[in-house]
């Protein structure tokens, strides 16, 4: 956890870049004065150029219209991202995610609202990470049993389990 303070964020980003292949950042992407993460990330990447994404603006306008909320300049800020960022469209809220790649490190900035972050992770971040790092697709299955203890079941399937490939656990 890092304070919403410019120097703390910059230091954390520098340290993370030295140690990690993937850095996940949550929160601070909103339109209020205390949401400084987007601005600080742009500074970290030495990126003064801002790109306005009309698709984000249109999405926010549609969302606000649905709830009869006026669209204003503060909201327009949500659709402006640093030029080095790849837009990760957030269909569950107003703050889009951002994907950066620099010096062999991926940085992903996502909104701090848990369900919005989960949506971005599921539909944008994890698929990109799998592709970028050539990760295998993992299938997880749970087998429910009853009436017999774990040790008895383990004994019954031991021969079969021993023949499974090493990548199956």
Question: Where do the PLM segments sit?
Answer:
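Glycine-rich beta-strand-to-loop/alpha-helix junction loops that act as flexible
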Residues: 25-33, 111
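Short, contiguous clusters of charged residues that form electrostatic/catalytic patches at enzyme active sites
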Residues: 7-14, 79, 123, 155
């Amino acid at each position: 956890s890092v304070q919403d303070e410019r120097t703390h964020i910059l230091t954390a980003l520098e340290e993370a870049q030295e140690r990690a292949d993937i850095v996940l950042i949550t929160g601070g992407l909103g339109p209020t004065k205390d949401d400084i993460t987007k601005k600080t990330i742009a500074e970290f990447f030495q990126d003064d150029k801002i790109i306005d994404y009309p698709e984000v603006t249109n999405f926010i306008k549609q969302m606000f219209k649905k709830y009869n909320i006026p669209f204003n300049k503060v909201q327009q800020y949500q659709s402006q991202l640093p030029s080095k960022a790849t837009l990760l469209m957030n269909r569950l809220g107003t703050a889009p995610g951002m994907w950066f790649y620099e010096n062999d490190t991926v940085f992903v900035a996502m909104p701090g609202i848990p369900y919005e972050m989960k949506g971005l992770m599921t539909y944008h971040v994890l698929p990109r990470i799998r592709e970028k790092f050539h990760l295998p697709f993992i299938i997880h299955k749970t087998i429910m049993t009853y009436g017999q203890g774990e040790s008895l079941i383990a004994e019954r399937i031991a021969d079969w389990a021993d023949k499974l490939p090493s990548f199956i656990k």
